[in-house]
Amino acid sequence: MSAFGGSGKPDLQPAPASASRLMPAGPPQPALVAQIGTLHLRLPIAQSRVTAVGFQGGSAGALALSPLGTQRNQGVVQRVVHAIVGSSSSGPGWYQLPGGQGPSTSALEVGAAAGTDVYSPVDGTVLSIENIVLNGRIYGSRLDLQPTGAPSLIVSISHIKIDPSLVVGSPVAAGASKLGSIVDFSGAEKQSLARYTNDSGNHVVIEVHPAAAPALG
């Protein structure tokens, strides 16, 4: 999978969510936020709309991602080590969040106000679209993509209202194809990202899972 974007170092700072932030901002500028092997994940939201970026444990089976920025809430030991050996700073600053299952960086959360446009983090094809139902209520959907350059992986994007133009089989382009918009998840759970934003912490979630092995027989 080819890397998307250049070598710029966007400085993303938590920003308040106001009515003006709900106006369409268009696609994000090229910026990589994480990777796993040769697969790079591009920032899915316009930089001016991002409130914070966080990583936490993902759902069952989610794979560990490598953040491409500097952890903003690292401990004293980590700060000393990074001061000596350096750290990755090519991506946006991020926060380690509690909770989830599996590796502590297996879920990427990119915060923005509900209604903010979300774009594809990879080139690929839509594999499935499923509603997220909690306590009998639908809170957006989960979209699974098969990355063009990494067919053995599945990129899952959730906490979004799917764009009606997308169907199973639709091709998507990193940073150019709109997947949908962020849903208001504040009524479903207390969101960890809210600790680092000036709002309820709404966000899009991105995870990477192994693709299911084909059945033999």
Tell what function each PLM region has.
Residues 1-117, 121, 215-216:
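Polar/charged, compositionally biased leader and regulatory segments
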Residues 99, 131-136, 194-195:
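Short linear motifs in intrinsically disordered
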Residues 100-111, 144-145, 149-163, 208:
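Small beta-barrel nucleic-acid-binding modules, principally OB-folds
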Residues 104-106, 114-116, 122-125, 139-141, ...:
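Envelope-exposed proteins and targeting segments
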Residues 107, 119, 127-128, 173, ...:
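Hydrophobic beta-strand signal
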Residues 115-116, 129, 167-168:
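Short loop/turn microsegments at loop-to-beta-strand junctions
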Residues 121-161:
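Zn2+-dependent peptidoglycan hydrolase active-site motif and core
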Residues 138-146, 162-217:
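Conserved, short, structured surface segments that act as functional micro-motifs
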